[in-house]
Amino acid sequence: GAYLTIMVLLGVFSLFFAWQLKQTYAYGFAAVCGVCFLVSCYPVFFSYGTWPVRPWYVLEVVCLMGVYPLIARLQGKIVKLPQRLIRVETVILSGGMVLAGVFFMFGAGNARFGQIYALLLFLYKTGCALCLLYQAFRAYRNEVCKTPVLLVGTVLFGASLVADRMYPGYEPIYGGWFQEIGLFMLVLSIGYELAKDLA
């Protein structure tokens, strides 16, 4: 509940700043918050009743795959990467949404295809984490970001993806999913960098 509330508030404040102060990064941050909200709505939605898994689970997975290119694009702009590199990263990382869509349209229920999908998903998440870590480390080393907040948030996010693969049977009754916790930390660190620019 608190996670969803924070995402909504961050998204609303971002839209306000984007509109009032013409802060272009704020629109991207609002989109990231909105997609994070959609990803986290799925378990809450299902706690209030019995619903068919399709299309809701598919929507959650596609949104989760969609948040990675959004974050990479936003982080790339914050750390002032070359525009061409940002575009290439965004296109490559958007492949995760295509991968998830293809799996759920054609391969759901096929055990062999499921194994291939799990391997590709692992490689995709590893690539996302490495891409974001490279961007954050480069920004900190080149002093684009004066504090290590973005780097720390990105390291926590990368660690959450590793933990998600190491403990696939983890039941998130108390702590939440590893990915959600890591994503939350990364969103807060990006929000901090954007707020610092506004100050």
Which residues make up each language-model segment?
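Short, intrinsically disordered, charge-balanced linker/junction segments flanking boundaries
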Residues: G1, T24, D197-A199
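Extracytoplasmic
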Residues: G1-S14
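Short, hydrophobic transmembrane alpha-helix segments
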Residues: F13-T24
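Secretory-pathway-linked proteins and extracytosolic
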Residues: F29
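Interfacial "cap-and-anchor" motif at the non-cytosolic start of specific transmembrane alpha-helices
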Residues: C33, F37-A199
